[in-house]
């Protein structure tokens, strides 16, 4: 098996390693989402708030992800940008039931979407409108309008409704992110 894995890697047929940054305000569900993306036997039983950052590894069909789960508390948000230069993708997680912090959320999301490393390198961004299971949560369409994303034409981004606790919506979002990262990596080779 090791021989075939080595041979696959040599010819570019194996899974590609990619770095992604996972950001969003505190208590949006970033760590819970990453926990859902791991294999069942490697999932944590207890989720605690992230301090600084934690690296989580998981795979999709064609990519091996090294996800930098960044703390969302205000004192840590300034550290997010130092990870963009070495990333091939960004996941921005938001709590779709947190209507009180929509303006703050918009500011932080725009900081990410307009960051020089994200823009100049064309890094794809997947926005996860999490906690859709909570009564009164905003829909992805409502969030798109509330954050002004319907007017945002530059960059590669998409928004997906998710529920971190059940995993609903995560497969589709990760398929989208994987496809966008694959396109991004291919465009960087030419």
From Swiss-Prot:
Species in which this protein is naturally found: Caenorhabditis elegans
Binding site for GTP: 24-31, 69-73, 130-133
GO-annotated molecular function: GTP binding; GTPase activity
BP terms from Gene Ontology: cilium assembly; intracellular protein transport; intracellular transport; PERK-mediated unfolded protein response; protein localization to cilium; vesicle-mediated transport
Keyword set, alphabetical order: Cytoplasm, GTP-binding, Lipoprotein, Myristate, Nucleotide-binding
Lipidation (N-myristoyl glycine): 2
Any single Pfam family the record assigns to this protein: Arf
Family the UniProt entry places it in: Belongs to the small GTPase superfamily. Arf family.
Cellular location(s): Cytoplasm
GO cellular component: axoneme; cytoplasm; cytosol; dendrite
Tissue expression notes: Specifically expressed in ciliated cells.
Main location: cytoplasm
Xref: InterPro entries: Arl6, P-loop_NTPase, Small_GTP-bd, Small_GTPase_ARF, Small_GTPase_ARF/SAR
Keyword Lipoprotein in annotation: yes
UniProt name for this protein: ADP-ribosylation factor-like protein 6
């Amino acid at each position: 098996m090791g021989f075939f894995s080595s041979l696959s890697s040599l010819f570019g047929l194996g899974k590609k390693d990619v770095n992604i940054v996972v950001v969003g305000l505190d208590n949006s569900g970033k760590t819970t989402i990453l926990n859902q993306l791991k294999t069942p036997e490697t999932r944590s039983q207890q989720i605690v708030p992230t301090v600084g950052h934690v690296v989580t590894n998981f795979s999709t069909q064609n990519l091996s992800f090294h996800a930098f789960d960044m703390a969302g508390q205000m004192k840590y948000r300034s550290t997010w940008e130092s990870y963009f230069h070495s990333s091939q993708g960004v996941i921005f997680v938001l709590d779709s039931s947190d209507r009180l912090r929509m303006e703050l959320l918009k500011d932080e999301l725009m900081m990410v979407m307009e960051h020089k490393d994200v823009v100049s390198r064309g890094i794809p961004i997947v926005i996860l409108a999490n906690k859709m299971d909570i009564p009164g949560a905003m829909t992805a369409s409502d969030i798109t309008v509330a954050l002004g994303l319907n007017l945002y034409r530059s960059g590669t981004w998409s928004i997906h409704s998710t529920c971190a606790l059940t995993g609903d919506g995560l497969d589709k979002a990760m398929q989208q992110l994987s496809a966008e990262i694959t396109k991004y990596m291919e465009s960087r080779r030419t």
